[in-house]
Amino acid sequence: AVLVGAKGAGKTCTFLQVCQSRNWATYLQRVGELAHDAGVAQQRIIFPVLWSDNVEGAAKATVGETKNIGLRQLDLGTETLSLSEIQRQIETNLESENYHWDDFWTNLIATTLGCPGCSLQEINQQLSSKGHSVVLMFDGVEDVFKKPSESKQTRAIESLLKLVNRLGELSNQNIGALIFVRIDYVQAAIKQNLGQFMSRFSAFALIWNPESFLRLAYWLCAKAEIVGATIEGAQTLSVEELIEKLTELWGHKLGQADSKEGHSARWVYAALCDLTGRFQARDLVRFFRFAAEEEIKNQNAFWADRILSPESMRKAIPRCSHEKVQEATLEIQPLRSWSERMDAENIIERSIPFSASSVSLQSDELTALRELGVVYEDLDPSLGEKRLFLPEIYRAGLRFDLSG
């Protein structure tokens, strides 16, 4: 599977959790899932092939140990490649492209597993004869491919992403793969049917839903030692209990309990989401930081029943948006191109709803940003050309107002 997530979505953290498990059955047990066939899952050995340069210390040792144990258990050979050797091989093929990237990844996998020169079919057959299967793990793609829009790097990334297709063609498949990759790399590599590709792997996307949002909010409270929150409670409390506990943080509503204001938890989640309902953990972390800073500057005894007042929460959102856009323009190429073009063309009038032509938004950018939840197009004909909208988490950062 391809696990797509933005920077900070938890790709490397998840990669490390899987590596620590050593086999698929143990990982499923850790995350509270039951294996359809525990015996088969136990034989699915975790084997890291590529990982991030940022993995250091104990985490790096864990990855290395998982790889060495996997090499012994799979029993395909005793020699493997180090991370630096793998990185050098990738760099060499980027310069020369002596090997088609499909062949390159096959050779790299075979050599890393200790059986250089073997095809995927041959590796699969050897695993079958030994009663084993393997889950190949790839992370840190952005460390070895720093310019995904360059043609050579695009071809390399596309081939890696499509490795799962080639593995799926094996009869009696004993080789699987988990490829952790940033969304902008998928955009750069998959030129056709991007939406179809994303849909295919949507079940594996590293995203946060409303329940995990509440659990993270409560966990952050536990780390900050406020509202009596506990680390254990972040996992064990029901959604209703979490909502009730968090009222000490931000109240029931963005006003008094009998007001017509929105419910606080729902309001924060909606303010931090994109237009597909996706939320990123780092957005909530910075929301807490900015809201706390605003609260310190403007303490109001009227809201003594909560830690964060409605005013502080409202003021935090534009600050979150500005940081969000700064990060997202580095990760999402169509957003970067559009933002830079608006600045270069000195487009000052930016209001919602808007038309693509009024803000120099090109059709291919619109398509990509719509799929990513950055732009929403309302098809109501009564709106005319001005039918495009931005979520709040992007609006202020892109300097749009609501006066349209």
Task: Give names to the regions the model predicted.
Residues N23, A110, G114, E158-N165, ...:
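Alpha-helical repeat scaffolds in large eukaryotic proteins
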Residues V2-V135, V144-E150, T154:
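P-loop NTPase nucleotide-binding core
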Residues T14-L16, V135, L178-I183, L214-A217, ...:
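Short, hydrophobic, well-ordered secondary-structure elements
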Residues S52, V181-Y185, P381-E385:
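Short beta-alpha junction loops
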